[in-house]
Amino acid sequence: MPSYTLHYFNHRGRARSAVCCSQLLVSSTMTADRVFRMGQHEKQDAMSHDANVGIGQQNPNSPEYAMARYLAREFGFHGRNNMEMARVDFISDCFYDILDDYMRMYQDGNCRMMFQRSRDMSSSSEKRMRFQETCRRILPFMERTLEMYNGGSQYFMGDQMTMADMMCYCALENPLMEEPSMLSSYPKLMALRNRVMNHSKMSSYLQRRCRTDF
């Protein structure tokens, strides 16, 4: 059984789904995790500011979502057969679309995070409208998709938590901090996020993780 060290930043960004996947793995497989603060990793191993941080000693250019998929497949959170895997993928992709459009609102022209609203109000407004439209398009579909298994009272794949459920939690975490009523019309999704948050291994991670503004 291989072991891994997961490197990630102390912000709730695109790699958070990979971090959440890691918290559900048996303890013997995850040897350690290493949290970088912004500006710290550029001094490590001659990495540039824009470099992605990969898994262990593998290619450091692996995208963060690929890391989440890899961990989910490796340890059984990606569905039990090809049809389930396809379902987990399209649900995860939908939530990633929401997360990606949200993160774009905080990126400058070079795709670097600003962690503050853009001073270019026209650009910021256009990006926010895009994010809101993505939510209007995807959230009703995700609510209906969740209801297809056991009326939406468990997880997207029934009684088994998968990467799709973790993506629901991670992708909506920051948007809900800005707009707490965002899921008021989607009670099944809100209840699902609470189930993920209260999962025994997830809750312990959420309690001990670094508190950040973003």
From Swiss-Prot:
Record has Chloroplast as a keyword: no
Pfam families the record matches: GST_C_3
InterPro entries from the UniProt entry: Glutathione-S-Trfase_C-like, Glutathione-S-Trfase_C_sf, GST_C, GST_superfamily, S-crystallin
A molecular function GO annotation: structural constituent of eye lens
Residue stretches making up the GST C-terminal domain: 81-214
GO biological process: glutathione metabolic process
Keyword Acyltransferase applies: no
Coiled-coil region list: none
Tissue specificity statement from the Swiss-Prot or TrEMBL entry: Lens.
Keywords in alphabetical order: Eye lens protein
Positions of the GST N-terminal domain: 2-79
Domain of life: Eukaryota
Family: Belongs to the GST superfamily.
Function as written in the Swiss-Prot or TrEMBL entry: S-crystallins are structural components of squids and octopi eye lens. Contains relatively little GST activity (1/1000 of that of mammalian GST enzyme).
Name listed for the protein in its UniProt record: S-crystallin 1
Recorded name of the encoding gene: OCTS1
